[in-house]
Amino acid sequence: MTRSTSSAPSQRMLRVGEQVRAAITQVLQRGEVRDPLIEKTVISISEVRMSPDLKIATAYVTPLGVADHAAVIEALNKHAKFIRGRLGPQLRQMKYMPDVRFRDDTSFDNYQKIDALLRSPEVSRDLDPDTDDQE
């Protein structure tokens, strides 16, 4: 059996990442983390990426309605061990409970930048079919 050298995640990593994402979401929705900043913030978890050995879970989160994302990420990382402990009952099938790390998800910001570029007058002019006929 040969090992793949590509950096694409395996099906198992994707499946476990989705299970961890769902479990973290439930912990946060139930308000089990006693932190005023986390309790008053709506947190969207867009993705959880697992390390190849499934021992590290990196959760990409977007705090909604809060200007200071770094403070929310810091609070989540401060409570990461507690959250990891609360994952146990929902992830019984795992041999090891993964260490959870929280990171700010910048994909939505990237989407907004691309959308703004596509709507810019320069790009709109290039995409307009009427301007091709005039030349």
Curated annotation (Swiss-Prot):
Keywords: Cytoplasm, Ribosome biogenesis. InterPro entries: KH_dom-like_a/b (IPR015946), RbfA (IPR000238), RbfA_dom_sf (IPR023799), Ribosome-bd_factorA_CS (IPR020053). It is found in: Cytoplasm. One of its GO terms (biological process) is maturation of SSU-rRNA. SUPFAM superfamilies: Ribosome-binding factor A, RbfA. GO terms for molecular function: ribosomal small subunit binding. One of several proteins that assist in the late maturation steps of the functional core of the 30S ribosomal subunit. Associates with free 30S ribosomal subunits (but not with 30S subunits that are part of 70S ribosomes or polysomes). Required for efficient processing of 16S rRNA. May interact with the 5'-terminal helix region of 16S rRNA. This is Ribosome-binding factor A. The gene is rbfA.
